[in-house]
Amino acid sequence: ELLDVMALYKMNKFHWHLTDDQGWRIEIEKYPRLTQIGAYRDSTQIGGWNSPLYDVNIHGGYYTREDIREIVDFAAERHIEIVPEIEMPGHTSAAIAAYPELGSLKTPPTVATYFNPTWGVFNVADERVIQFIQDVFDEIFDLFPSRYIHIGGDEVHPESWEANSDISRFMKEKNLDNYSEVQMLFTNRVASLIH
């Protein structure tokens, strides 16, 4: 229905936010735990920001590769380009819950149940994170014909990096003075993976 309404109003770009702390919503064949673990949370906050109320039922779900292809085709028939978003280096609790080795903290987060930014941040000094991103991008590029991909980049908690000796070593090796520079270097590296 949303795509039909967009077409009615001649809107031709749909930015699809597919990942966040609260859930990973797209099937990636190389990383099945993203949807086995990362797509579900054991409860969810209700009643708005900072509400103490929770629905204690399991929440979640994800789009299969077939679902994605069908939606991309449906949008294209309406002259709508879908721009996928895969959040990084923050807003990655769902991915890290599924693959803890990607995270910056010693204790990996769970899939977030509340709607504020969490401490789930990629360990950007670890080459496994870059390989993970490349692998995910390879599958995203196969599914989406868009010339664009959105990589998020907001609300990264530097505290997640402060406690990580890999990040300290990385900063020294790269002659970086602060965490903004760490994020900038990471973002530039990720941008170079987009082909």
List PLM regions with ranges.
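Conserved, mostly hydrophobic/aromatic
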Residues: 6, 82, 133, 151-152, ...
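Hydrophobic faces of well-ordered beta-strands that scaffold small-molecule active sites
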Residues: 14-16, 82-86, 149-151
